Design a protein with these regions (language model features):
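Short amphipathic alpha-helices and their capping/turn segments at secondary-structure boundaries
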Residues: 1-12
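Hydrophobic alpha-helical positions that pack around
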Residues: 3-5, 53-161, 167-172, 182-183
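Active-site loop ensemble at the mouth of alpha/beta enzyme cores that anchors a bound cofactor
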Residues: 10, 87-117, 191-213, 217
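Gly-rich Lys/Arg/Thr-decorated short loops/hinges at beta-loop-alpha junctions or inter-strand turns
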Residues: 14-28, 147
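Short helix/loop capping segments that flank catalytic or ligand/cofactor-binding pockets
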Residues: 23-26, 91, 151, 163-165, ...
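Metallocofactor- and cofactor-centric catalytic cores in central/energy metabolism, strongly enriched
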Residues: 28-33, 58
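Histidine-anchored nucleotide/phosphate-binding helix
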Residues: 33-49
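Ferredoxin-type iron-sulfur electron-transfer modules and their immediate structural context
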Residues: 139, 161, 171-226
Length: 226
């Protein structure tokens, strides 16, 4: 859902969903401690835009480095909410309930209960846009799995996934499979020539599997799966 549309809503609570519930992805937890002050400023800008009286950053208990970096920077009106280290903590509706006590009805938007939700990278981009008039031209993502050098890297939007894979030293297995995002909710990548977009969640490299299993996995991860 576009951030500029979300920020037009007038709500009571602005929530940063920083749970990063997908295994193997490390982007949000790393950005939170590396750019803690910018994240807090981004929350303040978003609160101003939406009229929110409270800002909440919801993150998992195990992200100790991020918690330690953010805690001393929190002004009045912004707080951390510590989520359990379980899946699916990070699901938007569940996170709203855990962090605010408000329940979003089926098919309703968070704004219906007075909440706007954004992710860590979006909030950081809000701060850059306000302070430096930066457009979103880069994406930070995790490259993990069967690669020579697992890493989190910031790359230009439009860079091919093949080039991203090369930054991690390439695959370490024969006939690998590739997932855009995490292993639970990510989608199969059919071509490494596909570009990085504003919504690319990560690049996971998995060992090859027999064709029958691969077909089953493709069906599970496809948009048409029931």
């Amino acid at each position: 859902f576009p951030a500029h549309v979300k920020l037009q809503a007038q709500v009571e609570i602005f929530l940063v969903n920083a749970a990063e519930c997908e295994p193997m992805l490390k982007v949000d937890q790393q950005l939170m401690w590396q750019q803690a002050a910018r994240l807090v400023r981004g929350v303040q800008y978003a609160m101003t835009a939406t009229g929110a009286r409270e800002g909440v950053i919801a993150l998992k208990e195990k992200y100790r480095r991020a918690i330690d970096a953010l805690t001393p920077l929190l002004p009045a009106g912004i707080r951390l909410h510590i989520l359990p280290d379980v899946y699916p903590a990070g699901d938007e509706v569940l996170t709203i309930w855990l962090a605010t006590g408000r329940r979003v009805a089926p098919a309703a938007l968070p704004a219906s209960v007075g909440v706007v939700v954004n992710n860590v990278q979006t909030v950081l981009n809000i701060a850059r846009a306000v302070e430096q008039q930066f457009a979103v031209t880069r994406r930070t993502l995790t490259v993990n799995g069967a690669v020579a050098r697992p890493l989190t890297v910031t790359v230009p939007i439009g860079m091919s996934l093949r080039e991203v894979l090369a930054l991690a030293g390439g695959a370490t297995v024969d006939d690998p499979g590739f997932i855009n995002g995490g292993p639970m909710m990510g989608g199969l990548i059919t071509s490494l020539d596909s570009p990085v977009t504003k919504t690319t969640g990560g690049l996971l490299v998995l060992p090859g599997v027999p064709s029958v299993q691969a077909d089953a996995l493709a069906a599970i991860l496809s948009e048409d799966a029931v």
